[in-house]
């Protein structure tokens, strides 16, 4: 934990935990909202597929562009822009499922922009000899948030309902963005000589030229795709269980 003595890195970790808390609430509330609106596992699968599409197709394009930009500005604005988008989900998304899918897609694009930059700036915030420790702490924070925040998110959604959970999620993104605004400047280290499309092509070319990397990515993609379909079928019973929990919590509140 010595690495937390660096104030900028400690601020990054704090923003990460706040953002992760909101993301877990968002994940649970979104699935509950979709099921309440449709009572159809197909729409749950479409939501998961929309998220996967944003990550697989646009993440390489965003990463190549982000390399040449002010990374602090991207970190801050990718959080601040998610705040109004997530707040619109219960307002617009609940009225129109296509609008809901669009909001989910935009949220996923901002996440794909934010998360790689967040990991990439760690060496700029700590000494070189402490980079491994800092990365390990980020990984630990991710595992802790997965264990603690998902369970808490389920209870919160059951207690206040998905709509209010989205508003709380919006506040966490706002808080995270404000925390990140206190980071030191994070300019690109060096502007690459190659153009944007050339860098995208180079990254994709590396994927296709390396059989081991290609097989690994293909396996992960297939697992994610089929896993999303499988999870969509499982979500029906899981969300029904959550509905029962919601009813039990409602009775306790009375």
Protein language model features and the residues they cover:
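Alpha-helical transmembrane-bundle signature of multi-pass membrane transport and export proteins
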Residues: 1-238, 244-246
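Hydrophobic alpha-helical segments, chiefly the membrane-spanning helices
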Residues: 239, 247-254
